[in-house]
């Protein structure tokens, strides 16, 4: 039976989670809460997306929004505790406003009647951070009620970092992500951003900024704690990002050995989560990719036998949203 989901925050991730859910028979979105638009506006942005194109579904506005004949309740409530999720049958809330990332704040959805909350962002003092394909076996249905789905960069990195660690071992790693701009940035220069680099026009610069994804990997792979760090370069593209990971191994390897290990896991245990490409593709070719991470096989490098570079692409909206939906289905399967 499909789990009933409510989405709090219908921005880039909220809408992409909905799009992913439409294709998944194990998920039924029954309600959306968002302060920024009425039902007409929400339906329009759901149906027509500047990055991902038109939604292949019938979207109709009535008292709420109907998608493929199923009614979606639309709310505009500022306080999560007032959303009455229980009264409308919501089992799991996807918290995608970016505002309620602390456990005590996200837990207000539980007070409103939801059984579980998935935060679509790195969280603070959450019950657990889960990356599908990496540590979902650590989830405890009885103990974990506020769950973080980590970040898009973390799920990309963790998908192949675990493989490399288990097979080859390492001394240390350094990561850089070239990340498409997001709504937290500015279209034009504005002094309202706490980070002066982040205050600059998103489409006019490559913007050096911090990124917690590397250290956050240790939340799902504790064995990498203190062995991984990194940064981000925000670039002038609307979607899709790429991780460049350089790491020092404890033993010598070849490019062929590294690629063979990654191919094997992508075709086996992590199929649908980790993929690889042997073609000379560019950023636009990965738009719409539903996996967490796609290894660019042609870009793998080895120097002096033990210094290795691996490059992996990820659709930071679509891939991430599909992992949110997969996590919701997994939680439901484990019992609410």
Curated annotation (Swiss-Prot):
Its EC number is 1.2.1.12. GO terms for cellular component: cytoplasm. It catalyses: D-glyceraldehyde 3-phosphate + phosphate + NAD(+) = (2R)-3-phospho-glyceroyl phosphate + NADH + H(+). D-glyceraldehyde 3-phosphate binds at residues 151-153, 182, 211-212, 234. NAD(+) binds at residues 12-13, 34, 78, 120, 183, 316. Pathway: Carbohydrate degradation; glycolysis; pyruvate from D-glyceraldehyde 3-phosphate: step 1/5. It is found in: Cytoplasm. One of its GO terms (biological process) is glycolytic process. The record marks 179 as: Activates thiol group during catalysis. InterPro entries: GlycerAld/Erythrose_P_DH, GlycerAld_3-P_DH_AS, GlycerAld_3-P_DH_cat, GlycerAld_3-P_DH_NAD(P)-bd, Glyceraldehyde-3-P_DH_1, NAD(P)-bd_dom_sf. PANTHER family: GLYCERALDEHYDE-3-PHOSPHATE DEHYDROGENASE 2. Catalyzes the oxidative phosphorylation of glyceraldehyde 3-phosphate (G3P) to 1,3-bisphosphoglycerate (BPG) using the cofactor NAD. The first reaction step involves the formation of a hemiacetal intermediate between G3P and a cysteine residue, and this hemiacetal intermediate is then oxidized to a thioester, with concomitant reduction of NAD to NADH. The reduced NADH is then exchanged with the second NAD, and the thioester is attacked by a nucleophilic inorganic phosphate to produce BPG. This is Glyceraldehyde-3-phosphate dehydrogenase. It comes from Heyndrickxia coagulans. The gene is gap.
